[in-house]
């Protein structure tokens, strides 16, 4: 039975026994909700998400493209793969580099 995490995101259909799953474990989510693309899933239960955004350069009154990479926990019930568009939510630090957890993954069209 999946618990309500307080976001307008449906619970995954699969079950898992991961303690760091926000739906089936005890990990609370709070803070930022971000969307990005998975660029790596080689680590165990971890994915790397890349976000692209525009930054204003005030001297030239133009925008420049920037990107950032964020490490996030990937529960077994969601299992995002490279190329998927994922929604991640901020949580307490899970490890030295992971403070986000994947809450939704969708395959791009």
Swiss-Prot record:
* InterPro entries linked: NA-bd_OB-fold, Ribosomal_uS17, Ribosomal_uS17_arc/euk, Ribosomal_uS17_archaeal, Ribosomal_uS17_CS
The record's annotation in Gene3D superfamilies points to: 2.40.50.1000
Q: Name one GO cellular component term.
A: cytosolic small ribosomal subunit
Which controlled-vocabulary keywords does the entry list? Ribonucleoprotein, Ribosomal protein, RNA-binding, rRNA-binding
Q: What does this protein do?
A: One of the primary rRNA binding proteins, it binds specifically to the 5'-end of 16S ribosomal RNA.
SUPFAM superfamilies hit by this protein: Nucleic acid-binding proteins
Presence of the UniProt keyword Metal-binding in the record: no
From the Swiss-Prot or TrEMBL record, give the protein name: Small ribosomal subunit protein uS17A
Which GO BP terms apply?
A: translation
Q: Which domain of life is it from?
A: Archaea
Q: Which GO terms describe its molecular function?
A: rRNA binding; structural constituent of ribosome
Family per similarity comment: Belongs to the universal ribosomal protein uS17 family.
Q: How does it assemble?
A: Part of the 30S ribosomal subunit.
